[in-house]
Regions:
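Gly/Ser-rich oxyanion-binding loop with an adjacent helix/lid
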Residues: 1-18, 25-38, 76-77, 82-196
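C-terminal nucleotide
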Residues: 1-28, 49-85, 178-248
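Conserved strand-loop elements at the edges of beta-sheets that form or border functional pockets
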Residues: 20-21, 42-44
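Short Gly/aromatic-enriched secondary-structure transition segments
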Residues: 36-43, 222-223
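Short, charge-rich binding segments
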Residues: 41-43, 51-54, 100-101
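A generic beta-sheet turn/junction motif
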Residues: 43-46, 175
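A general secondary-structure signal for short beta-strands and their flanking turns/coil
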Residues: 45, 104, 201-203
Length: 248
């Protein structure tokens, strides 16, 4: 694991722990989650690893194997607005955690993504893995849905991406050889096991050669377009969109 090696090279010792969050694949659900629809997906064995150790002075030190430049902030003075670099996802995660729990301990961390950036929810994976690490050094235990909604809030409120909960839910709730089926209106879900009668199959993940960040893409425009389409369709059907929507 390269993040462990870089951590040792940087700090002269091994990290205290490794946090991991998988990437996800969603056969159905893109732009459905933020419109309170039903989605499905599953996690894969690739994802984000974070090698980390506690820092009792409250400082968070970050470096990444996928991005240049290091980042640093204090858990008691997290910038109110995003800085505009790769570490905003970690700042947002720390800010959401600090709004609910008292934080005393920071950490030193090396972050490693095992696939090219973008396309398989790497931003959500970074946030969830970092939330796990920061919560751990502060003795905080987060439940599954608490993690999902906190990670979603970090993207919505801090990074500025108006995503739904598809990515976070797939990464937190998925189990091996099962498909997650989630209703984004009421958060009810089930894990559907693979039917023994199914023929063997494989799923291929192809890299287009392009890397992207949702924060720098037209994702929010797509979200607005989906909402406008929903308003139009429901108005045509004589349905009240406002009464059919719930916060998510």
């Amino acid at each position: 694991m390269n993040c462990k090696t870089l951590y040792y090279d940087t700090y002269g010792r091994s990290p205290d722990a490794i946090a991991f969050c998988p990437y996800r694949i969603s056969p159905l659900g893109a732009h459905i989650d933020h419109q309170y629809g039903k989605i499905n997906g599953f996690a894969i064995d690739k994802g984000i690893h974070i090698a980390y150790s506690a820092k009792h002075n409250g400082v968070v030190e970050l470096q990444s194997l996928n991005f240049p430049k290091r980042a640093q902030f204090h858990i008691h003075s997290i910038p109110e607005e995003k800085v505009g670099d790769w570490a905003d996802h970690c700042r947002g995660a720390a800010k959401m955690l600090a709004e609910k729990y008292p934080l005393r301990v920071g950490l030193s961390a090396v972050i490693e993504g095992t696939l090219p950036v973008g396309g398989l929810s790497s931003s959500a994976s970074v946030i969830i893995a970092f939330l796990s690490a920061l919560a751990n050094v502060n003795g905080i235990q987060l439940g599954d849905w608490e993690t999902i909604m906190m990670a979603k809030a970090a993207e919505n409120k801090y990074v500025g991406v108006n995503c739904g909960k598809l990515d976070q839910s797939c990464e937190v709730l998925s189990k091996r050889d099962q498909l997650l089926y989630l209703d984004c209106r009421d958060d009810s879900y089930e894990l559907i096991p693979r039917n023994p009668a199914m023929k063997p199959f494989r799923i291929a993940i192809l890299f287009s050669g392009l890397e992207r960040s949702l924060a720098n893409s037209k994702y929010n425009l797509r979200q607005d377009e989906c909402k406008a389409a929903a308003y139009s369709l429901m108005a045509y059907a004589g349905m009240d969109y406002a009464s059919s929507s719930t916060p998510g």
